[in-house]
Amino acid sequence: MLFAATSWWALGARLCLRFVERGVHAATLSPVGHPLRHVPGAGRAHTYRTLSSLESLEAALEAEQPALIVPCNDQVVFQLHNLYKRRPKWRPLIDASLGDPRAHEVVTRREKLLALAGEVGIPVPETAAVTSEDELATLFDRLGPEAVLKIDGSSAGEGVRIVGSLEEAVRAFRALSRPIGLGTAIKRAVINGDTLSLWEWRHAPPPAVTVQRFVTGHPANAMVACVRGRVVGAVCVEVLSSEGRTGAAVVVRVIDSPPMLEAARLLVERLGLTGFYGLDFVIDGATSVPTLLELNPRCTQLGHLSLPGQGDLGGLFVAEALGLPVGPPPPAIPRDVIGLFPQCVRLGQMDSNRSDIYYDVPSDHPALATELSKPAWPERRLLARLYHRLRAPEYVRMIDARPNKSAVGL
């Protein structure tokens, strides 16, 4: 296996550890200092290089000859799609890892994905591509008074704007539709440690902006493991608190949601998907019906969670995709409310006196836990610290994600 990541999230390391615990040889491809490099027992750590990122990916594939590759953020998926078009020799591996290549354009284009979801009977908000301010005005008149503007390929709440007026919508459209400039790409590479910023500057198409009808309710997420169009395991959660209004979940509750599972099954089957995928929903406040907002074409932060009666998605995927015996799953999480690590630490939400929340700390691997609790490697470097003294990063506040409800006392 080869785990590949460029975003500085912990989720790839947590999932990779599950594979290693099952006896799977898991090499990694990431920037220097990335959490994947701290997974105990992982194989060789290959370096994703800023000035030759696609070449780095191909070199790692040549060296490892993996049975499968697990992309841990959207940009790696985009590079795999690019490699699929350019280098036929890697197509069997990418097919085995991601599924039917005809799905590539659908899973990375929100409007197409939601249109297909609607065709198979999944509740979705009205969504339309927008290419001009005049078009936006017409669409907002129909979709407002509150709407959501998004760009394809964004994640963790970036590239998302919730707007309450046409004026706000126009400002958001201007910001989101502006292509990344060379100066911004260099800043992201040097300060933020974004390995693929220069590659995206050279190769990414102009930002694709969509406008979506706002759905009142509270967020929910699902992550699925699937093999050749069949779901082999899933985790569904409702989000109790998150990093801001559009950011990543911090505290979640595991739920049994047949409608969310059915939506995942329908999409996976229709698109012939393999690998790990995340689905974002809003549970309607009036009807309790989950409405699908988008699909993330890679693993999310739920993949390592071991649930009663199921185990973790990593183990289920290993057994089905590789045909390997995986043995008993890790101990199941003892409570349904989970404080996701390391977000709880970084946002100061760890409280050892709380018996109703299970804090998702990898206690069996203290060195990894210590590393993940630190700021991301780029933020620790002198240049980034000096930069942020001059331009302070935006403060992220944890919010209750459920309207008019207490997030288990948070």
Put a short name on every predicted segment:
Residues 130, 160-165, 225-227, 254:
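Short beta-strand-to-turn element immediately C-terminal to the catalytic PLP-Schiff-base lysine
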Residues 315-410:
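Peripheral (often C-terminal) accessory segments that flank ATP-dependent C-N-forming ligase machineries
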Residues 174, 178-242, 254-262, 283, ...:
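Phosphate-binding site of ATP-dependent enzymes
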Residues 269-304:
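Conserved metal-phosphate-binding beta-hairpin within the catalytic cores
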Residues 157, 239-252, 296-310:
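Glycine-rich phosphate/pyrophosphate-binding beta-alpha loops
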Residues 1-100, 134, 394-395, 400-403, ...:
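ATP-binding N-terminal substructure of ATP-dependent carboxylate-amine bond-forming enzymes
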Residues 43, 89-159, 177-198:
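A conserved helix-loop-beta module that forms one wall/lid of the active-site cleft
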Residues 245-250, 255-279:
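Oxyanion-binding "anion nests"
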